[in-house]
Design a protein with these regions (language model features):
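Short linear motifs at protein or domain termini
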Residues: 1-94, 98, 211-230
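Short helix-capping and inter-helix turn/linker motifs at the boundaries of alpha-helical repeat units
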Residues: 7, 106, 171-175
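A short secondary-structure junction motif
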Residues: 19, 23, 154-161, 165, ...
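Mobile beta-alpha loop/short-helix "lid" or hinge segments that flank ligand
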Residues: 56-61, 152-157, 171-174
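Conserved amphipathic alpha-helical segments that form helical-bundle/coiled-coil interaction surfaces
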Residues: 81, 102-163, 177-186, 194-206
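Short helix-capping/hinge motifs at transmembrane helix termini and TM-loop junctions
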Residues: 97-98, 143, 167
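C-terminal regulatory/effector modules of DNA-binding transcriptional regulators
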Residues: 172-230
Length: 230
């Protein structure tokens, strides 16, 4: 792929990813290639490349011969995602506590401040994305590209339903904000055991919130996240 086409495909991918993670395109809904091409003033070719990448990331699925839809998360999917998140993010936090430096800590604090500002303004979507960006940077601080790639793979799936769950449980944002601040402090102090405990607690709390949301919506088979957005 030539550099210009690659750049267009990259831009299209992040546009699609943002539309999915912010709830502009909901689980089960069709991703319309021509609409995205028009929005970005691009041909259909880079859009198709972007959708193939999103499919590889698990964010969209093929829908017969007429394109792609946003992936719907089953109960089994969600259980697997939480399990993978526990393993990957716990490892990232503990290794980052050993490997990160003062410059890294400054960047973590900057990202936390970005998320905190969004939280203060009630912008849940921006808060969530900044929070996940912080965790992505922590993964980067491990210095382990394989672990970083695993984080990104799991994170793409987390983002498929995290915003809908947060909107259904908005008080959880304050808890996440405080948890992230405590996590940064543990990493600064190179306390890998505390960092691990904080991640474990955060993921367990998210898992409990997920099941509470299922209970509240009287579903135990498939989580129809489009029903939770309103």
């Amino acid at each position: 792929m030539n550099p210009k086409l690659q750049l267009s495909a990259d831009n299209a991918y992040y546009h699609i990813r943002n539309a999915i993670t912010t709830g502009k395109i909901l689980p089960g809904e069709r991703v319309i290639t021509q609409q995205i091409a028009t929005e970005l003033s691009l041909s259909r070719t880079p859009i198709k490349e972007a959708l193939a990448r999103a499919e590889a990331d698990g964010m969209v699925v093929r829908a017969g011969n007429w394109g792609y839809t946003v992936r719907e998360i089953t109960l089994r999917d969600a259980e697997n995602i939480f399990e993978a998140r526990m393993v990957v993010e716990l490892a990232c936090a503990q290794i980052a506590a050993d490997n990160s430096n003062a410059s890294d800590h400054e960047e973590m604090t900057r990202l936390w401040s970005k998320a905190h500002a969004a939280f203060d303004k009630g912008r849940l979507s921006d808060f969530l994305l900044a929070s996940r960006q912080l965790h992505g940077f922590i993964a980067k601080c491990t210095g382990n590209n394989i672990l970083l790639n695993l984080f990104n793979q799991v994170n793409n799936l987390v983002l498929l339903f995290a915003l809908s769950l947060l909107r259904a449980n908005p008080k959880r944002a304050a808890e996440i904000d405080a948890e992230n601040k405590a996590l940064i402090e543990a990493i600064k102090q190179k306390d890998k055991d505390l960092a691990g405990r904080l991640i474990r607690s955060q993921v367990v709390r998210a898992y409990e919130m997920y099941h509470q949301t299922l209970t509240n919506n009287q579903s135990n088979r498939i989580i129809k996240l489009k029903e939770l957005v309103s």
